[in-house]
Regions:
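Active-site-proximal or metal-binding-adjacent scaffold patches in catalytic folds
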Residues: 1-150, 159-198
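Walker B catalytic acidic pair
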Residues: 155
């Protein structure tokens, strides 16, 4: 049996992707020109994985990000802003993540970054380019500050090691002792952050 799903066409993906989030319909993101038959085959092929993943996510404690009349900052509910909520989240993310980058780069002596970009990538929380551009998901501002700080430190460490070599991980462990705890938080609650529709 094919699981029910919402199909979204995006020019930003090269191949179809399945997104499973708690208390949300399964979403299939496909490049333009993908046929209904191809989507059907994809869902059939991954049906068992979708069922397992859905059950796993539903069993996890929810943050309640989708509670009506609520916005979130630093892992805590706050009074919702008036107007465009995503724009508000992006503004908060730029302000808070920039402050985190400035603070952590000074603490670690990593000053090779050039600029900060705030976006909404679906497959990573942050990235670091060879030219020193640090990119972050605005959704990090919803997570506790220590989790967002972990992502900032992770990307700053890439200024020294543009890979995930043993040297990179050794540097990250020394720079951010709570790295494993932050990674676990993102594994548990990341799908709920990605499902947030402000």
């Amino acid at each position: 049996m094919t699981p029910p799903a919402v199909v979204r066409v995006s020019r930003r993906v090269r191949r179809a992707r399945i997104l499973v989030a708690p208390r949300r319909p399964v979403e299939v993101v496909v490049p333009p020109g993908t046929s209904d038959a191809a989507v059907e085959r994809l869902l059939r092929r991954h049906g068992e994985w979708i069922a397992r993943r859905t059950a796993e996510l539903e069993s996890r404690p929810a943050l309640g990000l989708d509670a009506p009349g609520t916005a979130w900052l630093d892992g805590q509910p706050v009074a919702p802003p008036a107007g465009d909520r995503e724009r508000w989240y992006r503004r908060q993310a730029r302000e808070r993540l920039t402050a985190s980058v400035e603070r952590e780069s000074a603490r670690l002596g990593l000053d090779g970054w050039r600029r900060i970009r705030i976006g909404d990538p679906r497959s990573r929380w942050g990235s670091c380019s060879a030219r020193g551009t640090l990119s972050f998901s605005w959704r990090l501002v919803v997570a506790p500050a220590w989790v967002a700080d972990y992502v900032v430190v992770h990307e700053l460490c890439h200024l020294r090691h543009m890979n995930h070599s043993p040297s990179f991980w050794a540097m990250l462990r020394a720079a951010y002792p709570r790295h494993a705890e932050a990674q676990a938080w993102l594994r548990t609650h990341g799908p709920e952050l990605l499902a947030l529709n402000p």
